């Protein structure tokens, strides 16, 4: 239950592993559908969770472990009721990759890359993605956004102004 909530949150929000691990019980506001993140440089941001399945996974975890997580103060805890570590999150990702038969080496940070890239490919403004990821500089965000060659071609065919000019 916890593992699914961790994986769902990583992919749905693009949070850094360190941000997920330091997420406090009071930082998760499921009724409002948002989490408060303390990013690099002690920057605070709010990230919305719009997907009902993600909210459901977080709610199930929160209800099942309410006593433990309220007592510890951390939202995601290990079996010793301590906050999850970065290594624990890597182990969770590896475990579910093995179970799914994924042979490629997948890291938790790849969820962040995928989050940014998929939003960009769906036409989301890079400045909005920058805010979601908590980047100070747009240059940092551009590193995360790998647009596939075919997608670039489709965008150019569909959006480039030259395609709307027809000579007789």
Language-model features and meaning:
Residues 1-168:
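Conserved catalytic core of the tyrosine transesterase superfamily
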């Amino acid at each position: 239950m916890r593992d699914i909530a961790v994986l769902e949150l990583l992919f749905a929000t693009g949070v850094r592993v360190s941000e997920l691990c330091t997420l406090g019980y009071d930082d998760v506001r499921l009724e409002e559908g948002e989490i408060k993140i303390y990013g690099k440089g002690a920057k605070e941001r709010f990230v919305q969770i719009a997907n009902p399945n993600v909210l459901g996974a977080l709610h199930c975890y929160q209800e099942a472990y309410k006593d433990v997580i309220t007592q510890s103060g951390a939202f995601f805890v290990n079996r010793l009721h301590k906050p999850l570590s970065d290594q624990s999150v890597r182990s969770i990702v590896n475990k579910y990759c093995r179970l799914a038969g994924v042979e490629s080496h997948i890291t938790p940070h790849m969820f962040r890359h995928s989050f940014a890239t998929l939003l960009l490919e769906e036409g989301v403004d890079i400045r909005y993605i920058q805010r979601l990821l908590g980047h100070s500089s747009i240059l940092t965000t551009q590193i995360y956004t790998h647009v596939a060659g075919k997608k670039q071609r489709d965008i150019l065919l569909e959006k480039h102004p030259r395609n709307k000019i027809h000579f007789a």
